[in-house]
């Protein structure tokens, strides 16, 4: 009986909080009468509704956790019983880092061994690409691009040859349409 009463009270607090929030929103949004009294009631209902709603949520959560406390304790005890036993370790002196002088000797040995393995310098690269340069080439520099006026002249010549071979159906620098283009529309 006590369980059912607590559940009903929790549901009533949630419903009351929700209704108070809805009433506060309605009073604020209703345009029929904007009296001072309605606005004061609305601004009191909104926060009060939020407080009642949140307290109902936390109350229901607490009741559910309190009802199932024995289950949580049982699961926690089982989890703690299956934990690994703590391991005893032995602290050895070689675990600590080497002295400064010893670490320098190791770096020197590693550097000299690394150079001995390679035995040849890395390949040469150009500034413009990451492709290796061929040493057989006579010209180490890539070919320079043509100057701007030359590029414009070449582009204009190719456009003229294309227009001579086949007339373009694209609209040129005017608003006049050709007769064949009008017939296709």
Curated annotation (Swiss-Prot):
It is a multi-pass membrane protein. It comes from the Eukaryota. The chain crosses the membrane at residues 8-28, 39-59. Residues 125-149 are annotated as: Disordered. It is found in: Membrane. One of its GO terms (cellular component) is membrane. The keyword Transmembrane helix applies. Keywords: Membrane, Transmembrane, Transmembrane helix. Coiled coil: none annotated. This is Transmembrane protein 252. The lineage of its organism: Eukaryota, Metazoa, Chordata, Craniata, Vertebrata.
């Amino acid at each position: 009986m006590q369980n059912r009463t607590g559940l009903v009270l929790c549901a009533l607090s949630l419903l009351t909080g929700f209704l108070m929030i809805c009433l506060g929103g309605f009073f604020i949004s209703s345009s029929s009468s904007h009296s001072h009294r309605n606005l004061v009631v609305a601004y009191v209902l909104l926060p009060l509704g939020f407080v009642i709603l949140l307290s109902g949520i936390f109350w229901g959560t607490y009741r559910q956790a309190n009802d199932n406390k024995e289950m949580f304790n049982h699961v926690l005890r089982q989890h703690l019983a299956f934990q690994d036993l703590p391991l005893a370790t032995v602290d050895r002196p070689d675990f600590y880092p080497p002295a400064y002088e010893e670490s320098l000797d190791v770096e020197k040995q590693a550097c000299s061994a690394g150079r001995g393995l390679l035995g040849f310098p890395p390949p040469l690269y150009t500034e413009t690409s990451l492709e290796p340069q061929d040493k057989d080439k006579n010209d180490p520099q890539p070919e320079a691009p043509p100057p701007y006026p030359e590029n414009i002249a070449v582009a204009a010549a190719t456009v003229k040859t294309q227009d001579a071979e086949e007339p373009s159906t694209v609209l040129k620098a005017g608003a006049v349409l050709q007769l064949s283009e009008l017939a296709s529309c």
